């Protein structure tokens, strides 16, 4: 591994939809590309995982029993590939060098995930977008992001959301909701605090990988966090 900081950023698929609620908003892509470029220009190596909820969710697709859960999850994996290609285009348009690596082999579209190759791309200053989740049904893209972060020896995983971090209650419903600046892995799981799913948190805990939850729409926020400024976000760690 290089001596540079290495961060994995996780975006939800819904974030790409903007106010539309579905599909991909190119204005959001352009904004995210600008934030990622700021990280790269400051010498930070970047991996990215994007969910697929702006297109389809495996659980939702399978809820009435017509589509099997495994098939629904495979559809969700393909949705993440669509988002990864869109993000690659936006990042390349901004002048960055980018590679997409998929957990499912699809050579005509992108590389297949190989840990060593991904690390070499990062060392050369390329942004690597990891698509298709873990390649297995029943695992979320949060778990996939945590797994890839560990595999590439990332210093942290940043979960970029629409809110400043994790609250003791839903800030959209309760005006007195309090931002939790620091939480232990154990509390996040025991209190069912919606940071990530329990599998992802447990994996991060076992590998001492900090999870930082932040507002992606605060300009420059990702760079501040990557440089150690956690004043307006939530950090999950031991």
Curated annotation (Swiss-Prot):
Signal sequence extent: none
Activation/inhibition comment: Allosterically activated by GTP. Inhibited by UTP.
GO cellular component, one term: cytosol
Sections of the chain in a coiled coil: none
The entry's keywords: Allosteric enzyme, ATP-binding, Cytoplasm, Kinase, Nucleotide-binding, Pyrimidine biosynthesis, Transferase
Domain of life: Bacteria
Binding site for ATP: 10-13, 53, 57, 161, 167, 170
GO terms for MF: ATP binding; UMP kinase activity
Cellular location(s): Cytoplasm
Catalysed transformations (reactions): UMP + ATP = UDP + ADP
Residue numbers spanned by region Involved in allosteric activation by GTP: 18-23
Alphabetized CDD domains for the sequence: AAK_UMPK-PyrH-Ec
GO terms for biological process, alphabetical: 'de novo' CTP biosynthetic process; UDP biosynthetic process
Sites where the protein binds UMP: 52, 73, 134-141
Documented EC number(s): 2.7.4.22
Pathway note: Pyrimidine metabolism; CTP biosynthesis via de novo pathway; UDP from UMP (UMPK route): step 1/1
Pfam families attached to this UniProt entry: AA_kinase
Gene3D superfamilies in UniProt: Acetylglutamate kinase-like
InterPro entries the record matches: AceGlu_kinase-like_sf, Asp/Glu/Uridylate_kinase, Uridylate_kinase, Uridylate_kinase_bac
Subunit and partners: Homohexamer.
Protein role: Catalyzes the reversible phosphorylation of UMP to UDP.
HAMAP family: PyrH_B (MF_01220_B)
Family: Belongs to the UMP kinase family.
Protein name listed in UniProt: Uridylate kinase
Taxonomic source organism: Campylobacter fetus subsp. fetus (strain 82-40)
Gene name for this UniProt entry: pyrH
């Amino acid at each position: 591994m290089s001596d540079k900081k290495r961060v994995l950023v996780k975006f939800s698929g819904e974030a790409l939809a903007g106010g539309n609620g579905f599909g991909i908003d190119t204005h959001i892509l352009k904004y995210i590309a600008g934030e990622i470029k700021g990280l790269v220009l400051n010498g930070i190596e970047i991996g990215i995982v994007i969910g697929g909820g702006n297109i389809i969710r495996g659980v939702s697709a399978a809820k009435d029993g017509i589509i099997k859960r495994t098939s629904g999850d495979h559809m969700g994996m393909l949705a993440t590939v669509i988002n990864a290609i869109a993000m690659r285009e936006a990042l390349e348009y901004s002048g960055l060098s980018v590679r997409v690596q998929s957990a499912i082999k699809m050579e005509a579209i992108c590389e297949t995930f190989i840990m060593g190759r991904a690390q070499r791309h990062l060392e050369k200053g390329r942004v690597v977008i990891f698509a298709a989740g873990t390649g297995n049904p029943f695992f979320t893209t949060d778990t996939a992001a945590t797994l890839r972060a560990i595999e590439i020896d990332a210093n942290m995983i940043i979960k970029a959301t629409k809110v400043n971090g994790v609250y003791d209650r839903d800030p959209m419903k309760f005006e007195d909701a309090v931002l939790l600046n620091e939480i232990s892995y154990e509390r996040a799981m025991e209190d069912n605090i919606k940071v990530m799913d329990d599998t992802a948190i447990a994996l991060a805990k076992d590998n001492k990988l900090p999870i930082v939850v932040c507002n992606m729409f605060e300009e420059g926020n990702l760079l501040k966090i990557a440089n150690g400024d956690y004043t307006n976000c939530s950090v999950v760690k031991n």
